[in-house]
């Protein structure tokens, strides 16, 4: 099927974050550390670690930084981060999910709440918007890296166990059941595809247009959340401008 490109949005955010590369690497180091600490330092036996390492490489994080975070997890460090999800609404009633890794839950909760309230949003209770999103595996193949056409990619995706294929001018975007994500990713790599992105993500069941007079506030809110050192991911149900 065809549709709006989540990959296009990701690329836009990535370009915007290039100026904040140090902060991005700091967050990725934390994710790598936690993945290695909880599941072991070998990515071949730790799918979560492998996924985060792939994410770090896609962000052009130096290999030495990745190795340092893994070695730290192997050592005697007693650093611990809690995984917390915050839920709320952005200006215009757009649902927002915020995933954080924090060593101080009170600090992070306060910072997230301030970001919402200062930018026209509201932080909600647990369960207030999470039901509006589905956990999915998300894999991207840059069309410039393959000679396969849409029909061939669709066949390979179905053979691999993927759920859905969306096409855009620059990418093939594959969605999977989260439990099948690793198997689908590995099958597509074995089939010779070079993956531009492979991660677990949250997909909104429905999208909400951001009112024109709320777009600036909406952007400021998302920027404030993504700039927070403890925030790993921000997901919204905002509709693209071309939807």
From Swiss-Prot:
Highest rank taxon of the organism: Bacteria
Gene Ontology MF annotations: DNA binding
GO CC annotation: cytosol
Subcellular locations according to the entry: Cytoplasm
Gene3D superfamilies registered for this protein in UniProt: 1.10.10.200, 3.30.70.980
GO biological process, one term: regulation of DNA-templated transcription
One Pfam family, short name: TACO1_YebC_N
Segments for region (Disordered): 1-22
Broad class of where this protein is predominantly found: cytoplasm
InterPro entries listed in its UniProt record: Integrase-like_N (IPR017856), TACO1_YebC-like_2nd/3rd_dom (IPR048300), TACO1_YebC_N (IPR049083), Transcrip_reg_TACO1-like (IPR002876), Transcrip_reg_TACO1-like_dom3 (IPR026564), YebC-like (IPR029072)
Keywords: Cytoplasm, DNA-binding, Transcription, Transcription regulation
Recorded family membership: Belongs to the TACO1 family.
UniProt xrefs under PANTHER family: TRANSCRIPTIONAL REGULATORY PROTEIN YEBC-RELATED (PTHR12532:SF6), TRANSLATIONAL ACTIVATOR OF CYTOCHROME C OXIDASE 1 (PTHR12532)
Protein known as: Probable transcriptional regulatory protein LGAS_1276
Organism in which the protein naturally occurs: Lactobacillus gasseri (strain ATCC 33323 / DSM 20243 / BCRC 14619 / CIP 102991 / JCM 1131 / KCTC 3163 / NCIMB 11718 / NCTC 13722 / AM63)
